[in-house]
């Protein structure tokens, strides 16, 4: 059985599993077939063990169907295939093609506006030439090695990152990239709502790469910085220096890639930079507030390349993680915070880590200025404006409308006595979201759903928790709702 059979197997599996599952666990596998045995190579033991447990049986079934009823013996090990193989399904993604890097596209007004508003901190390779040279429009000459500024925040490390179920996969993938930059997970695409820790993980990767190799050239920047540097380089007739700078790094970390939307020339330059880095075995890491395919006004060829490596969602933190974050931040601030107080804040602030930390800072400041002890009543008074705003933003009505629209049913169906599966499951999802995202009690939630008993709400919440463990479709739906309602 040639290795192309493995690619056919991947085509089948891709249609069966959600995109994130497929890209995370199956796509990185490499294959080698010899004498009736298919050896699958995983990038690390974590992936190998997970595939063995969750996917191996289905892989064997698909291979058997594709091979005329005779399944090869499938083995797994950590490492790389002994000869070049292509573990990536390319049927929908064109292979990298060397394109002329010069384009007829011009800089848009929006890109010029960005360049005018972003503070001037361009790399030395693109520094403005002397007035005389600028008047003659001569290309800027760069002598010797390029000096890189990482702009990494040294306080954002893996040690200071609080891990929980919501970010466990993202942290594991980030750590793997830091240990093996330019490896299987290239590019690494981290996406999720605001304030969930994507930027922290990105800095942690960069800091860990530098810790392991102090000579590594790591560049972190927000996407508007890339746009501003490109516009300045064009204005100074220094586009070659711009390209040389960004393509000479060992790891390029771009934050908030969605900012490239509607900026055609920036997308063009990043497309070629992206290709050059991947072809050179250099690591690319990007963050975004949404899944790659959901980014509007961005070229399809660029969005497709984001999916070549590993795409991981960073989810809103669950209660236990929120409590752990608060306790860790309080410890760093040398503030005594009881577990009762931490739980109170964590139960009230559910949306993201940034808002959670902001709430804690406000409570600590009020306690410092008033000399008060941090207790639940004191916290409630300190955060009354924030809690009122939070409750207003995420209401049961909003949840019901969002869920009904998503499942293409009516809000009245959610409130009715109907018990068909097409209504019952969305109703349970909406109840669970109401419990997690609002401060309403179970009886209040029950009243909002047609006068149901609080035990019905509790059963619905438990059911959705169970289904998220066993049903990929429900898990993906729930994650989508959390993003829609909290960002």
From Swiss-Prot:
It comes from the Bacteria. The keyword Cytoplasm applies. Its main location: cytoplasm. Pfam families: Bac_DnaA, Bac_DnaA_C, DnaA_N. Residues 151-367 are annotated as: Domain III, AAA+ region. PROSITE patterns: DNAA. GO terms for biological process: DNA replication initiation; regulation of DNA replication. GO terms for cellular component: cytoplasm; plasma membrane. ATP binds at residues 195, 197-199. Residues 368-487 are annotated as: Domain IV, binds dsDNA. Residues 1-79 are annotated as: Domain I, interacts with DnaA modulators. Keywords: ATP-binding, Cytoplasm, DNA replication, DNA-binding, Lipid-binding, Nucleotide-binding. CDD domains: AAA, Bac_DnaA_C. GO terms for molecular function: ATP binding; ATP hydrolysis activity; DNA replication origin binding; lipid binding. Residues 79-150 are annotated as: Domain II. The keyword Lipid metabolism does not apply. Domain I is involved in oligomerization and binding regulators, domain II is flexibile and of varying length in different bacteria, domain III forms the AAA+ region, while domain IV binds dsDNA. Oligomerizes as a right-handed, spiral filament on DNA at oriC. HAMAP family: DnaA_bact. Belongs to the DnaA family. Plays an essential role in the initiation and regulation of chromosomal replication. ATP-DnaA binds to the origin of replication (oriC) to initiate formation of the DNA replication initiation complex once per cell cycle. Binds the DnaA box (a 9 base pair repeat at the origin) and separates the double-stranded (ds)DNA. Forms a right-handed helical filament on oriC DNA; dsDNA binds to the exterior of the filament while single-stranded (ss)DNA is stabiized in the filament's interior. This is Chromosomal replication initiator protein DnaA.
């Amino acid at each position: 059985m040639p290795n192309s059979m493995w690619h056919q197997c991947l085509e089948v599996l891709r249609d069966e599993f959600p995109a994130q599952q497929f890209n995370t666990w199956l796509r990185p596998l490499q294959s080698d077939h010899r004498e009736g045995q298919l050896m699958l190579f995983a990038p690390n033991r974590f992936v190998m063990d997970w595939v063995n447990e969750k996917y191996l049986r289905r892989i064997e079934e698909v291979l058997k169907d594709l091979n005329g009823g005779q399944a090869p013996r499938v083995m797994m090990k950590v490492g790389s295939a002994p000869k070049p193989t292509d573990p990536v399904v390319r049927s929908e993604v064109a292979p990298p093609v060397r394109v002329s890097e010069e384009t007829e596209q011009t800089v848009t007004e929006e890109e010029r506006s960005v360049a005018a508003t972003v503070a001037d901190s361009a790399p030395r390779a693109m520094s403005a030439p002397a007035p005389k040279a600028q008047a003659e429009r001569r290309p800027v000459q760069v002598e010797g090695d390029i000096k890189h500024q990482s702009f990494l925040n040294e306080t954002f490390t893996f040690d200071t990152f609080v891990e929980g179920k919501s970010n466990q996969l993202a942290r594991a993938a980030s750590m793997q990239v830091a240990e093996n930059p330019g490896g299987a997970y290239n590019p690494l695409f981290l996406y999720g709502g605001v304030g969930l820790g994507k930027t922290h993980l990105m800095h942690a990767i960069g800091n860990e790469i530098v810790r392991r190799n102090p000579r590594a050239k790591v560049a972190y920047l927000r996407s508007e910085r890339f746009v501003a540097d490109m516009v300045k380089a064009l204005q100074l007739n220094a586009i070659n220096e711009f390209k040389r700078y960004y393509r000479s790094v060992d790891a390029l970390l771009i934050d908030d890639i969605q900012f490239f939307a509607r900026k055609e020339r920036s997308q063009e330059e990043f497309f070629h930079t992206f290709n050059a880095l991947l072809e050179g075995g250099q690591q690319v890491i990007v963050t975004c507030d949404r899944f790659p395919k959901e980014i509007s006004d961005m070229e399809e060829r660029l969005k497709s390349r984001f999916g070549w490596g590993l795409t991981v969602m960073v989810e809103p933190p669950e209660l236990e993680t929120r409590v752990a974050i608060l306790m860790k931040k309080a410890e760093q601030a040398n503030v005594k915070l009881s577990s009762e107080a931490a739980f109170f804040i964590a139960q009230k602030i559910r949306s993201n880590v940034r808002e959670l930390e902001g709430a804690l800072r406000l409570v600590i400041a009020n306690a410092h200025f008033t000399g008060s002890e941090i207790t639940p009543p004191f916290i409630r008074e300190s955060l009354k404006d924030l809690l009122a705003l939070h409750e207003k933003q995420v209401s049961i009505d909003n949840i019901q409308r969002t869920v009904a629209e998503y499942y293409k049913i009516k809000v009245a169906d959610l409130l009715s006595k109907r018990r068909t599966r097409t209504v019952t499951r969305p109703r349970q999802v909406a109840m669970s979201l109401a419990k997690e995202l609002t401060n309403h009690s179970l009886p209040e939630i029950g009243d909002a759903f047609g006068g149901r008993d609080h035990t019905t709400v509790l059963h619905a919440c438990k059911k959705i928790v169970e289904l998220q463990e066993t049903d990929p479709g429900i898990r993906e739906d729930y994650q989508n709702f959390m993003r829609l309602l909290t960002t």
